[in-house]
Amino acid sequence: MARFNTKAARAQPTSRVTSTGRILRTYEGGRGRERDTRSELFLLAVANFVSQQTFYESGTDRDDRFAKLLRELAVTDPAWTAGLLGWLRGEGNMRTAAIVGAAEYVHARLTAGATDGPSNRQVVASVLQRPDEPGELLAYWTATYGRAVPKPVKRGIADAVRRLYHGKSLLKYDTASKGYRFGDILNLVHAAPDPDKPWQGELFRYALDRRHNPDTAVPPTSSPVLGAHRELMALPVGQRRAVVTEPGGAERLAAAGLTWEALAGWLQGPMDKAAWEAVIPSMGTMALVRNLRNFDEAGVSDEIAASVAARIGDPAEVARSRQFPFRYLAAYRHAPSLRWAYPLEQALGHSLANVPALPGRTLVLVDRSGSMFYSRLSERSELNRADAAAIFGTALALRAADADLVEFGTTSRRLTFGKGESVLKILDRFGDLGGTDTTSAIRSHYRGQDRVLIVTDEQYAFNRHGDPTQQVPAHIPVYTWNLAGYRVGHGPSGTGHRHVFGGLSDAAFRTVSLIESGRDGRWPWLA
């Protein structure tokens, strides 16, 4: 009798975050699973704003664990590690972690004498995507390893400098508040101008003059933006507000590369309606999102507000900005004016484009325990992991054909919602539910659904019935979305219909769609 070689037989799809089989305890005493080194590093990297404390780990402990894991894999698996770092800075949008990771990658490989795999120079260049980041990497290196900067680091930075330095970037990022000015970096790495950018040699010389002879430095004629900026700076203070209010004022500010951050200082006065309306056309999308409340307080016109709303809700702008979904919730809470609610809802939806529309019946569980509320996601955010979990869980439930949305902690409860309802409105229904009894939540709400998705930090409390994934029949997929990157998971993963993903963006949700279609999940940079 044929038992395996049948048309109905299908290999169980696998995923990349893999447990080792070793039993460890979660921070709350639950029976957890150790993950292999690559899996532990990936989950930590995609959820780790460097030096940010969490409920169970100090910022220093997390940073040390990240560096230790990365140094190990830089030597033993350099291709995988280089792929992670490039993806982390790009689609993963974890800027500081990628920069720190690149420095640790190079240091570990130089110390070990390793030469196989992607070059140190290539990895350094791959994580530097913004003009201020060469200085960030240099500052981290010298603070951690001293002022002797090895050649691969210098060459990688030089490659990035040729790609990133131009007139506007110099105005925005080459400021007196920086420890490493553009001129310092050019002196240190000896970057040659890009031969395809004939103006860059003059720009480099000007950056050096600005650093060493600021009173006599003259902007090059090959850079109209630097010349226009110098003209504005030379205007007497009493004449500056007229530039803002006169016809063509917005265009003149944009041509001079004057950012909204610099405008108030240049005016030496308040950012009133006229000032905001002049600078709004040249502001980036996320700068607009962060300043919605300021626009309301200044009384910007409905016409200007409509142009802001159109840009915020534009899918191409959202994709270009590469912002985390929780940024739009933060803006919604900070500026609850009705005129911003709809474009922010649109933007949030576009930022969750990879969240799948799952068929059949789905149980979605959102962790609202105390540890999820403990610390902010980043220095610039007032939101926490509980907020991020609610965003992802709600989006999953709304897009699924038939979903039960449950919040859990010490207790659990089902949340009601209507098809097509606003994600931002549903988020107001979530609460703070204390401890982390994930097992009981699943036992209370699993009623034969086709799959279970849990958005959590995985630090569940001991339960005599076992780990959360054991409460679901073995043939039913259980997907865990990890938002914290702690070492121990709440169940097995990688095979047998048990899968773990992670991060604060929607990027890895693509893997859910792969597995649902019977294909193996892959690391995001290999998908």
Functional labels for PLM-detected ranges:
Residues A2-L383, L398-A527:
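Long lumenal/extracellular ectodomains of secretory and single-pass membrane proteins
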